UniProtKB/Swiss-Prot annotation:
Belongs to the class-II aminoacyl-tRNA synthetase family. Type-1 seryl-tRNA synthetase subfamily. NCBIfam families: serS. It is found in: Cytoplasm. One of its GO terms (biological process) is seryl-tRNA aminoacylation. It comes from Aeropyrum pernix (strain ATCC 700893 / DSM 11879 / JCM 9820 / NBRC 100138 / K1). InterPro entries: aa-tRNA-synt_IIb, aa-tRNA-synth_II, aa-tRNA-synth_II/BPL/LPL, Ser-tRNA-ligase_type_1, Ser-tRNA-synth_1_N, SerRS_1_N_sf, SerRS_core, tRNA-bd_arm. This is Serine--tRNA ligase. Pfam families: Seryl_tRNA_N (PF02403), tRNA-synt_2b (PF00587). It is an enzyme of class 6 (ligase). ATP binds at R286, K287, E288, V302, E373, M374, V375, S376.
Length: 460
């Protein structure tokens, strides 16, 4: 039976696991603690089993005792062994709790082709499209392309594009973050009319694209219990990012990845049913507590948004190939939207606990003169599956192990809207609608057909 890869590495080569932890810029002492507790747990478990075996043996001997003295001696020994077993079991329970906590605190390993370092070590691996680059951003553009050895064809424009926040609120007058802040706080928003239609069209476009590739469409729960959420992610690390429902054992999901990963909680999946490819659609709720003052304007970094999420349960030997498929799907989606982008290989120190490797797809934002994250695609191998108790059963030999899980954004609606507002505007403030979205707008009588035009006043 195949065990959890991290536990096997902890037992066979703890120094190698420490090196993976160091690559993530984490304290390797967590490996020492987990190793020590695992050794102690196995020692106590062996002792409990031995005392239990001896107690059962003595119990059988009592019935066969030849004299009263021998019977009383055996009964006394059985009572002593029972007390010893109870004491050992109490110690075992305590160590088992500490061991489980320590094991759940261990991150995944790091794939060999992941750049090592903090976020500055992240490296672009691919560029697509012909970005519009304002003349004042040409040097910054070259630092994000040529500095990494890529020569990216681009169009230099004389006029300065307006940021998505100004486009949304001042030019198109189809969004209002100030009134949202008065009633809900910062990082909330009202969207109106054409931008709402655009949000819906993006979701339908991504759903249509993913289901046409055979992914099963899922509308998941928007909340999860603590004992589930804490196993999908390292909740202690991310507790400031997740909303907890006061007085309830429930947490709002930050992405459909969370309930999709939990779909087979404490269950088995047979190898013949893999890969299981899902696409979830849901609202997402995020505190963004660590964002500080970044992206306060507009709707790039907000507390709630809609997202279409790719998720795959995989055989271990197929997860690397499927990781490439997930990022390929995202690339096709953004190529269809005609939004210039680059794909980056995320550095080890910025992976988070669960991924062995992560790609981000970043869209070019002409007003900012930067590539900004739109998509994350992660291979979590068996890290989530072990925590969630999702076992793989191979029919041949009925061998058991753990499935691999992978996830990737298809479309996050508000972020993608920001990219459309910046990439598809003209000097007059008119925003062309990507051609791939237009057929999804035809079902709405009042939706725009080919462009969104500036307004003199907001609709509400």
């Amino acid at each position: 039976m195949a065990g959890w890869s991290i536990l096997e590495l902890l037992r066979s080569n703890p120094e190698a696991l420490k090196e993976h932890v160091r690559k993530r810029l984490m304290d390797p002492a967590i490996v020492d603690r987990a190793y020590r507790l695992d050794v102690e747990w196995r020692r106590l478990l062996t002792m409990v089993n031995e005392v239990r075996r001896r107690h059962n043996e003595i119990t059988r001997m009592i019935a066969k005792a030849g004299s009263r003295e021998e019977r009383e001696r055996l009964i006394a020994e059985a009572k002593r062994l029972l007390r010893e077993r109870e004491d050992l079991e109490e110690k075992l329970k305590k160590v088992e709790r500490e061991r489980e906590e320590a094991l759940l605190g261990l991150p995944n390993i790091v794939a060999p082709d992941v750049p090592v370092g903090d976020e500055s070590a992240t490296r672009p691996i691919e560029f697509w499209g012909k970005p519009k680059v304002w003349k004042g951003h040409v040097d910054a553009f070259r630092e994000q392309t040529e500095a990494y050895g890529f020569k990216v064809d681009h169009e230099v424009i004389e006029w300065r594009p307006r940021g998505h926040a100004d486009m949304m609120e001042e030019v198109l007058k189809l969004g209002d973050t100030l009134r949202a802040a008065r009633v809900a706080g910062s990082r909330f928003y009202y969207l109106f009319e054409d931008l709402v239609f655009l949000d819906l069209a993006l979701l339908m476009y991504a759903i249509d694209f993913m289901t046409s590739k055979g992914y099963v469409l899922v509308l998941p729960p928007y909340m999860l219990r603590y004992n589930v959420m804490s196993r999908v992610i390292d909740l202690e690390t991310f507790k400031d990012a997740i909303y907890e429902i006061a007085g309830e054992d429930l947490y709002l999901i930050a992405t459909a990845e969370h309930p999709l990963a939990a779909l087979y909680y404490n269950s088995e999946i047979y190898d013949e049913d893999l890969p299981l490819k899902l696409v979830g659609v849901s609202p997402c709720f995020r505190k963004e507590a660590g964002a500080g003052n970044r992206d306060l304007k507009g709707i790039f970094r907000v507390h709630q948004f809609h997202k279409v999420e790719q998720f795959v349960y995989s055989l271990p030997e197929e997860s690397s190939k499927l990781h490439e498929e997930l990022i390929s799907n995202a690339k096709e989606i953004f190529k269809g939207l005609e939004i210039p982008f680059r794909v980056v290989n995320i550095a080890s120190g910025d992976l988070g606990a669960c991924a062995v490797k992560k790609y981000d797809l970043e869209a070019w934002m002409p007003a900012q003169g930067k590539y900004r994250e739109m998509v994350s695609a992660s291979n979590c191998t068996d890290w989530q599956a072990y925590r969630l108790g999702i076992r793989l059963v191979r029919r041949k030999g009925m061998e058991r192990g753990y499935v691999h899980t992978l996830n990737a954004t298809a479309v996050a609606s508000t972020r993608t809207i920001t990219a459309i507002l910046e990439n598809f505007q003209d000097e007059e403030g008119v925003v062309a609608i990507p051609r791939a979205l237009r057929r999804y707008l035809e079902v709405f009588k009042r939706a725009p057909t080919d462009a969104i035009h500036p307004r003199r006043r907001p609709p509400a």
